[in-house]
Structures are given as structure tokens and as C-alpha cells.
Design a protein with these regions (language model features):
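Hydrophobic alpha-helical segments and their helix-loop junctions in multi-pass secondary transporters
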Residues: 139, 143-148, 152, 203-229, ...
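Hydrophobic, membrane-embedded alpha-helices of multi-pass small-molecule transporters
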Residues: 44-62, 212-218, 229-292, 308-330, ...
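Helix-loop-helix connectors at the membrane interface of multi-pass transporters/channels
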Residues: 142-170, 329-360, 402
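Membrane-interface "cap" regions at the ends of multi-pass membrane proteins
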Residues: 2-79, 89, 232-243, 262-272, ...
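C-terminal membrane-solvent junction of multi-pass transporters and transport-like membrane proteins
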Residues: 391-459, 464-485
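Membrane-interface loop-to-helix entry segments
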Residues: 173-215, 271-278, 381-393, 450-455
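Loop-to-transmembrane helix boundary motifs in multi-pass membrane proteins
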Residues: 167-176, 339-374, 415-431
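Juxtamembrane transmembrane-helix boundary signature
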Residues: 82-115, 124-130, 136-140, 324, ...
Length: 485
């Protein structure tokens, strides 16, 4: 062996060792299974997906949404609306996550199985686009809150102290910076996100407890407010609207729970990680905001704590919570857009890897965040709480009613048919019902439209048209030309 060969051999050995060490440190998994089921031997179990979900749903904006709900309803009605919305999300995400675990499918693949390889283009594009916008908004919000405390004029949080002068005190600059920083976490995949999620859970939980203590002592002493009994102090809203707002906080990602639930190893784990997300983590964020408004009788993005320790604790909470929400949104979006590139040619290996797609989506989201175009949460909540359940309802109807007894092979075979027309009719009918409710029955949550279309209309048409029988897709439902009949 020559000296050059020896050097090359040592280099390869060192390079392999460095890769192994970096994977252990950053928990990077080369295979994210973006376009095929996660096999049982690659499943991560409970803790890592649970930490990703917990960090994801520790969203700072949910504190303000909880505050808004309480301002519109007062206590205790505001607490009831928040709880019912979170209970709905738990059941909704749990049903989708259960089937994602069973078949090892992410959200895009579940959509393809339900709508067909061409039929799923529009719903997948809409959801992936919405969650990309949510990624951009969370990064923008992190920037605007920092500017409102330390910079110049913010969009939502008032005027800052001026510690950050000139361009350093503008929302657009920091929105772009935060979008890149937060987005880079998602580029390294589910395992790195789990590591970040652990840090977020420890940090935000500790600071949340501190917030509740501070609110119940410092703020309550100043205002004399009662957290358990208070009159509405903001824009009045109906109880149904309060529930809808609670659901709207995470109904898009609850619809996409398959991206996380597919990594679990049992049904209990699949339901468990969704329980961590909604009755616990997201509920805590909403509760803090509601608790503050019930005591203080006003809305404030810093919840009366901007002067405590120079605002450092509240700033840490919003950085960490918005950061983990950003990486979860980007991960969801990238799973969707990666699958959209496989339309018509699922067997062909494309040059765009999942990681490259994630970087592209991150760059697009960064541009949107830095442009300051997403500066109002209300339209987003209304849009996502109406659109997402239309698709989630179809997933529930498909995997729990139409194809509940099919095998994984049959379910995947059905994903290769072009269009599942009963599902398309179901989503269109759900859209019509939701539009009718928004226009003529505003006291009812439009979420019901998606559930009616997906869980009632779609199964009825599928059975009537011969696409399904006795909880199984027929040859017609799978695609006769592919089933060999």
C-alpha cells in the first residue's frame, strides 16, 4: 500500500467517524421517508415525536389568541371555549394520527391515498402553502415582538425602547434573520427538531410557570382582578367563535399530524403524542393568555411583564416558542412540496432531495416574512379553520369508514389511481356547507362543513358508487386498471 493509499484510507475512516459523531450530536437521520412509509424498524417511539409536537404547539401567538378569547367571552366561559377547542383537536388529530401510525404514512401520502395521485394536487398545495405562510408569520411575529420591546415602531406590539437603532430596530430585518435561524433546525430533520423540542419544553414550561405566578401576584395585585370570574373586556364574540378560535390555532398541523405520528411504534404512542400537543402544550399557551386577560382586563402582547428583568424572560419565551413552531411548520410544508414533485412518476428518483426542498421553502418563507405582508392573525385563523378540516374530514372518512379494513398494500395501490371522485365531491360539498355556515349561520363553527363533507357525504357516495363495500375499497375504488381486474 502506497503512502497516498494509506492517507486516503485514513481520511475515509476519519470522515466516516465524523459523520457518525455528527449524527449522534445533531440526531440527523439521512432518510426522512418523505415519499414512502416508515418501516417498523425505523420508528422512533414516543419521546422524540412527542417533544417535536410539544415544542411545535408551544406557540407564543397562542398566548395572545387565548387572551383574545377571554377578552371576548370573559371567565369562566373563555376557559370552557378554549378547552372544548383543544379537546376537538385531540380527537381530530388522534383519529388521523392513529391511521398514520398503522400505515407509516405522512400527511402527503395519506392525501394521495385519499384523493388520488392527481386529485390530491390542489388540497396538498393549499395546505402546504398555508403552513408555509404560518412558518413565515411565526418568524415575523418573533421579530415584531422584539422590535416592540427593544427597537422602533412595531406593527403589533407598540414602540420599543430604541436600544436597537435604525435598521436594527425594524421588523423586516429581524423577520428574515429569524426565519433562517429557525428554519435551519428543520433542514436537519425530525431528530434535530426533537432535540430542539426538548429544550423548548424545559425552557417554556419553566417560564410559563413563572408567568402564571407573576400574573397571579404582580398583575393581580395591581388590578385586583379575579382570574376565575371576569366580564368580557375586548371585542365581544360568540361561544362558537371562541371554540373556533381555539381550534384554529393548530388545525392545519393537526390535519398534518401524520408527519409526526408515523414515527411512533404503537397506537397508544400515536394517541399519546397528540395528547401532549393539544390538551397539554397548546392548551397551556392559550390558558396563560386567558388567565392574564381575566386578571388585567386588557390585551397586551407582553402580558404586563415587559418591564420585568428588562423583558428578558418574556423575550426568551417568545423566541423559543416561535422557533420550535417555525421548524414544525417548515417540516410539514417540505413533506408536502416534496411529494408534489412526484406526481405522475412516483418511482422516479428526483434530483431534489427532501433537504433541498426544505431549503427552498425556507428561502421563500424568509422572503415573505421579511416583506411584512403577514401582519394580521385574524384572517389567517378564519382561513385555516375553514380550509384545513375540509381535507382532514376526508382523511378521517377515508381511513376510518371507506378503507378501514384495507391492508397497507391495498391502500398504497389506491394512491396510484388518478382521481378518487367521491372524495372530490365530498370536499366540494364540505366547502359549500362551510360557506353557508359562514354566511347564514355564523354562530356555528365552519369546521363542521369539513366534517360533514368528509365523514358523511364522501362515504355515502363511495358506497353508493361501488368504490367501497364493508369498510374496504373495492377494485373500482383501488383502481381497476391497477388491481388486475
Amino acid at each position: 500500500m502506497t503512502q497516498a493509499d494509506l492517507i486516503f484510507k485514513n481520511f475515509k475512516s476519519d470522515h466516516t467517524y465524523i459523520n457518525q459523531v455528527s449524527k449522534k450530536i445533531f440526531m440527523v437521520e439521512a432518510e426522512e421517508y418523505s415519499d414512502r412509509p416508515v418501516p417498523q424498524d425505523a420508528r422512533l417511539g414516543f419521546m422524540k415525536p412527542a417533544m417535536v409536537w410539544a415544542g411545535f404547539t408551544y406557540a407564543y401567538i397562542c398566548i395572545f389568541i387565548g387572551s383574545t378569547i377571554m377578552g371576548g367571552l370573559g371567565a369562566p366561559l373563555g376557559y370552557y371555549a378554549i378547552f372544548l377547542g383543544q379537546a376537538f383537536l385531540f380527537v381530530y388529530a388522534g383519529l388521523i394520527g392513529h391511521r398514520a401510525y398503522k400505515f407509516g404514512l405522512n400527511f402527503p401520502m395519506m392525501c394521495k391515498c385519499s384523493f388520488g395521485r392527481v386529485g390530491y394536487i390542489i388540497p396538498m398545495t393549499i395546505i402546504a402553502g398555508l403552513v408555509t405562510g404560518w412558518f413565515a408569520f411565526q418568524a415575523w411575529l418573533a421579530a415584531d415582538l422584539m422590535v416592540g420591546l427593544y427597537g422602533g415602531e412595531s406593527f403589533l406590539a407598540g414602540t420599543g425602547s430604541g436600544v436597537l437603532p435604525g435598521i436594527l430596530g425594524t421588523t423586516g430585518l429581524w423577520a428574515g434573520i429569524f426565519a433562517i435561524i429557525f428554519g435551519c433546525i428543520a433542514v436537519y430533520g425530525i431528530r434535530t427538531m426533537a432535540w430542539m423540542g426538548r429544550a423548548a419544553v424545559v425552557c417554556v414550561t419553566a417560564l410559563a410557570i413563572w408567568m402564571i405566578y407573576s400574573l397571579s401576584t404582580i398583575v393581580a395585585t395591581e388590578t385586583g382582578g379575579n382570574p376565575w370570574s371576569s366580564a368580557p373586556s375586548g371585542e365581544p364574540m360568540t361561544f362558537a367563535l371562541g371554540i373556533t378560535a381555539s381550534i384554529g390555532t393548530f388545525v392545519v398541523s393537526a390535519t398534518m399530524t401524520g408527519d409526526f405520528s408515523r414515527w411512533t411504534k404503537s397506537v397508544k404512542q400515536a394517541w399519546g403524542i397528540n395528547a401532549v400537543a393539544f390538551p397539554i402544550a397548546n392548551h397551556l399557551m392559550l390558558f396563560i393568555g386567558a388567565f392574564y386577560t381575566a386578571i388585567a382586563g386588557q390585551l397586551d402582547f407582553f402580558f404586563g411583564l415587559s418591564m420585568v428583568a428588562l423583558g428578558a424572560p418574556i423575550m426568551i419565551i417568545q423566541w423559543v416558542s416561535n422557533g420550535t413552531t417555525c421548524d414544525g411548520c417548515l417540516y410539514n410544508a417540505s413533506q408536502g412540496f416534496r411529494n408534489l414533485l412526484l406526481i405522475g412518476k412516483p418511482e422516479k428518483k428526483l434530483s431534489f432531495s427532501w433537504k433541498k426542498i426544505t431549503i427552498i421553502v425556507m428561502i421563500c418563507g424568509t422572503a415573505v416574512a421579511a416583506s411584512n405582508v403577514l401582519n394580521d392573525i385574524v384572517p389567517w385563523l378564519l382561513l385555516i379553520s375553514t380550509v384545513a378540516p375540509l381535507i382532514g374530514g376526508i382523511l378521517i372518512g377515508h381511513f376510518w369508514i371507506v378503507a378501514r379494513n384495507n391492508t397497507q398494500e391495498e391502500v398504497l395501490l389506491a394512491s396510484e389511481r388518478k382521481v378518487n371522485w367521491p372524495a372530490i365531491v365530498g370536499i366540494l360539498s364540505g366547502t359549500a356547507v362551510a360557506a353557508y355556515m359562514i354566511t347564514y349561520v355564523p354562530d356555528l363553527p365552519p369546521i363542521l362543513g369539513g366534517l360533514i363533507g368528509g365523514c358523511a357525504v364522501y362515504p355515502l357516495i363511495a358506497y353508493a358508487a361501488g368504490y367501497a363495500s364493508r369498510g374496504k375499497l373495492t377494485a373500482k375504488g383501488i383502481g381497476a386498471e391497477r388491481s388486475g381486474t
